[in-house]
Amino acid sequence: MLIIGERINGMFGDIKRAIQERDPAPVQEWARRQEEGGARALDLNVGPAVQDKVSAMEWLVEVTQEVSNLTLCLDSTNIKAIEAGLKKCKNRAMINSTNAEREKVEKLFPLAVEHGAALIGLTMNKTGIPKDSDTRLAFAMELVAAADEFGLPMEDLYIDPLILPANVAQDHAPEVLKTLQQIKMLADPAPKTVLGLSNVSQNCQNRPLINRTFLAMAMACGLDAAIADACDEALIETAATAEILLNQTVYCDSFVKMFKTR
C-alpha cells in the first residue's frame, strides 16, 4: 500500500499562507511529519486561491525537495502548473490527475510519458462522477486504452474510481469497491488503483474511523495507493495490518514500524 500524504495542500490555512508568503517552514514541516508517519509520496496542491499557479507549484516542489526525496504527486487542474512542477522534480513524479475526456487525455498522457511520471486517471468525464460501477469501469477501460495508445506503462497508470462522502452518497461505496476489483481484470499487467481516501468521510462524524475502515475494505478489493492522512497513526496501523492479513507482506513483530520505514 502506497500512502500519498495529503497535507501539503493550499486548501489548508497554514499551507495557503505559506504559499502566499513563500514561507517554506510549514511545507517542510508537513513533508517531514508525513514521511515519518509512513507516507512514501507527497501530494502537492497549491489550492484554488493562488493566482499564479505555475510559480506556486514550482516553489512547492523546490522547498519540499529540500527536505524530502519522496515521490511528489503534482495535484492540479492547471496543466501548465503540472508541467512546470515536473521540470523541477529531481526524482520520478506522479501527475494528479486526468479524467477520461479526450482533450485532457491527449495532453496529460504524453506529458507523463515525456517525464517518466506516473499518472492518476479519474473514472469520470465532464458530465461528473458516475453512480454505478459499470460506468466507472467503462471510463477505466478508456484510460487503459489511452495508456496503450500513448505508451504509458500500465504499472504507471493509477485509476481512481472516485469515492464520495458517506453522508451524502452512501450508495457509492459498494460501487467503488466493486470497481476496484474489476479494474484488475482490464489488462495484464493490471493498472494500479488509488483513492482520495479522506473524501469518504468529508463532513462526517468520526472521520478517522470511517477512513481507516474503508481503507481496509478497499485494500481487500485490490487498492494499491491512497491519498490520505499519513499522520493518522491508527490509519497507518490499519494499512500495515491489512497488508499482513491479505498476505501482501511477511509478518514480523515490528510490522507497523517496518511499514513506516520501508
Curated annotation (Swiss-Prot):
Q: Which Enzyme Commission numbers does its entry carry?
A: 2.1.1.258
Query: Which residues bind methylcob(III)alamin per the record?
Result: 202-203
Keywords for the protein's UniProt record, in alphabetical order: Calcium, Carbon dioxide fixation, Cobalamin, Cobalt, Metal-binding, Methyltransferase, Transferase
Instruction: Report whether Heme shows up as a keyword of the record.
Output: no
What are the GO MF terms of this UniProt record?
A: calcium ion binding; cobalamin binding; methionine synthase activity; methyltetrahydrofolate:corrinoid/iron-sulfur protein methyltransferase activity; methyltransferase activity
The UniProt annotation places (6S)-5-methyl-5,6,7,8-tetrahydrofolate binding at 96, 160, 199, 202, 207
Which residues does the annotation say bind Ca(2+) 1?
Answer: 184, 222, 224
Transition state stabilizer, annotated site positions: 199
Family from the record: Belongs to the vitamin-B12 dependent methionine synthase family.
Name by which UniProt lists this protein: 5-methyltetrahydrofolate:corrinoid/iron-sulfur protein co-methyltransferase
- The UniProt gene name for this protein comes to acsE
